[in-house]
Amino acid sequence: VKNVFYVIIDAFCYNNLERKIGDEYTTPFLRELANGNICAKKMYSQAPYTEASLVALLSGENTLDNGGYLFGNRSTQKTVFKSFKEKGYKVIGQYSPYVYSKAYLRDIDQYFYTRLVSIQVVFDYRLSYYKSRYEKSIITSNEIRVCTEILEEEFETWIGQAESLLQKDDTCILIQDWQSIDTIKKVLEGLKKEKELFDENPTTYLYNIFEEFDSHNLLYLNRMYNNKRVIENSVYLENKYQEQFEVLQKKYTGIIRKDSPDFKYLLNILKNNRSGFRDFKGLVHNYMRYYGNNFLGEYLKSINNNTQTEVCMKKQFKHAIKAVNSANAAGMPGMVYLHVQDFHLPTAIHSSDYEDINYIENEIEEALCLGNKIDRGYKGNIIADLSARYCDNKIRGFYNDLVNNFGNDFKLIITADHGYPSYFNPPRSVIYNQTFVEAFHIPFIMCDGENNYSIDSISSSMDHFSIINNSDNWKSKRKYVLSEYAGPGCPDISDKAIWYTYIDNEYRVSVELKLCENISYDKLKGVYNIIYDKDEKNNLVKKAPNIVEVKTIMDIIQKRHNELKHKFENEKFLKSFFVEK
C-alpha cells in the first residue's frame, strides 16, 4: 500500500498550465507532470469556492445539501478521510481554523495548524450577512441559532489554539514563534472573559456584536493576537531588491497601458445586462485598477503586512513528509491532505517565514529573472504569474523530496478547490462572486507510474484507490458541471438566493433563485456561448428564449432546485436549523 499525498492548490486554473512569460511557461514542472502522468484536461470542480469544494471533495455531497456547506461537512455520514482510515491509513492534514468548521478534523488522526485563528474573517464572511438582517429586524430564530453555533465553535477553536501555543503542543509546531507568550496569555485571558459573557446569554452577546461590530472587543483581541512580528531580513531584502522591483514594475505598467479598453464589451454590458449601469461602473473601476496597479513596486515594502498569514509551502511539505515517515515506522501507510493557498492574491513570491536567507534570495532572483522576460505581447497580472512560478517550484521540490524519501512508494494528487481568473485579464465587471468558466476548469494531476488510464474527475481517484466504488455520489463521467453557491460562508439557504452555474462544452448559464421560486427566463443572469465567446463578454440573456439548448439547461437546474426544496422541506436536520420563520 503506497503513501498518498493530496495537494489542493487554492485558486488554480487549468489555463495556468498554458501561460507563458516570453517564451517560458510559468508552471513548467506542473505542466510536465500533467503531460507525463494521469491528467484530466476537462476537469471541472463541483463548486467554485473553497469550503463548498472541500465538502464535495471529502464527502461526495452536493454542495448545499444538509443545510448549506457551513454545516455540510458536519452532517455528512462518511468523508474520504474516514474511508482512508478504514483502509488502514494514518490520515494527516493541516488545519486553517479561520476557514473550516472543526468538524473537518473528525476523521483526521494527526493535524497541524498553518495559521493563527482570525475571527475577523468570521465577522466579514459569516456574521456580516446576519448583521444586515438584524438591522432590518428580519433575522429569524434559526439564523440566531446558526450564529451562536458559529461563535461557540470559534471560541472553542481560538481558546484551544492559544492554550496549545502556550503548551507548545505538536499541533502548533509550525506557528509556535508567530506570537509572543505574553501576548498569547493576554489574549487568552480576554477570550475567557468574553466566553463567560457569551455563555450567560448567547443571543444578547450576538446582538452586541451586531451593534458594535467593528469596535467589538473580540476584534480588538483578534488584532492583538494576529499582530504580525516584523519578518526577519525584510529590511535587508528591501534594500537589496527594491530598485529592481520598481524597474520591473515600470516596464510592466508600460506594457499593459498600451492596450485600450474593450469598448465593445463596455457597450455590450451597458446595453444587454439587466444590471447594466452598475456592472458598467464596475468594469470601468476594474480597468482603472488594471492600469494603475503597483503590485511589484509595493511587494517588498508590504511584506510585513501581507505575509505570514500562513506557513509557507516548503515548511508544510517538509512537515508532511516527516509525519508520513513516522507513520511508516509504526507500520502504517500515510494519507496527507494539504490545502495550500500560495496561488491566491495577495500572495508571496518567496517563502517569507523560511530561515535560510540564501534560499529566499534565490527565490526572489528567479522571480525577477522571469519577470524581466515580459514583452509587448504580455497580458495578465505579473504578480499572479510570478506567484504561479513560486508555487511550481515548491511542488517540484516536494516531488523530489518524496522520491528521495519514498522511492516509488507514493502517489501524488495535485488539483484545486476552484480556479480563478487571472486578475484583471481581461478586466471584467464582476470579480467577486464571478462564475466565469475558469473558476471551474481546474487541473487534476495524479502521479502514478503503475496505471495509465485517464481520469476526468476528483472522485475517480477514490475509484483508483478502491475507496469508493459505484456510488451515486461519485460521478466519473460528467457531461456538464452544475455548481451552487449562496454567498460567502453560505450560512443558510432559507432566505438567500442560490447562484446556479451550468457549464458544458458549449454554454455557460447562470441563474439566481430563492428556494420558494422556480426557474424562468427572467431569473437568468448570464448566458454565454463559450465556443465562440471564450472571454465570456457577450451575454446572450435577452436571446435565451430563442436558444433551444438553454431550455434544456434550465430544466436541469430546476431538477436540482427541486431536490434542494425537497430536502429543505423534509429533512429533520434542515428543519432544526432553517424552517422556522
Go through each PLM region and give its residues:
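Catalytic domains that recognize anionic headgroups
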Residues: V1-K581
